[in-house]
Amino acid sequence: MKSLLLLTTLLIPLHLGMAWSAKYAVDCPEHCDNTECRSSLRCKRTVLDDCGCCQVCAAGPGETCYRTVSGMDGVKCGPGLKCHFYSEEDDFGDEFGVCKDCPYGTFGMDCKETCNCQSGICDRVTGRCLDFPFFQYAAAKSPSRTSASQTERDAASGDGNAVREEIGDRNAARPSVMKWLNPR
């Protein structure tokens, strides 16, 4: 009798743990039916809803996100983004935040995947390793001493007075009023 009680005590939390860890959502159907899903063609990016049945619109960088709201568009962050939650709740008592890029070295939904690239830099959405060809191009095109012609070397020699005078003339033509640039 004791062994049956012990076995039951051990198996019930295991079964409940698997059910709770699978997903947290309210009013999910027992079986998914794609005909019940709304169209997500107008969305820039999509994610699975909390039930794991339908594609819904995803929130983008800088947009508001919520902990969990079943079947609603634009409340979960898209791939390569993570919801950074605020300490307060909204008027309905729901936790909310803002979508931000995954930190370097992570990627995927909620930034749960780890980048295994040699450089440690990967695409935040797909996890594909990124290489920067401009560094390789610059190293391959390093100047050599024999590439400059005699006229280029002659033009580069001198005391530099002509260059200073030319820069001084350009600065004199500028107005002294500070110009404000629009932010990007």
From Swiss-Prot:
Quote the PTM field.
O-glycosylated; contains chondroitin sulfate and dermatan sulfate.
Query: What are the start and end residues of every segment in region (Disordered)?
Result: 145-184
The Swiss-Prot or TrEMBL record annotates one GO molecular function as: integrin binding
* UniProt biased composition (Basic and acidic residues): 151-172
Origin superkingdom: Eukaryota
Expression sites (tissue/organ): Pineal gland specific.
For this chain, the annotated S-S bridges are: 28-51, 32-53, 37-54, 43-57, 65-83, 77-99
Please give the GO cellular component terms listed in this UniProt entry. extracellular region
Q: Function, please?
A: Involved in angiogenesis; promotes angiogenic sprouting. May have potent implications in lung endothelial cell-leukocyte interactions.
The protein's name is: Endothelial cell-specific molecule 1
What is the gene called?
Answer: Esm1
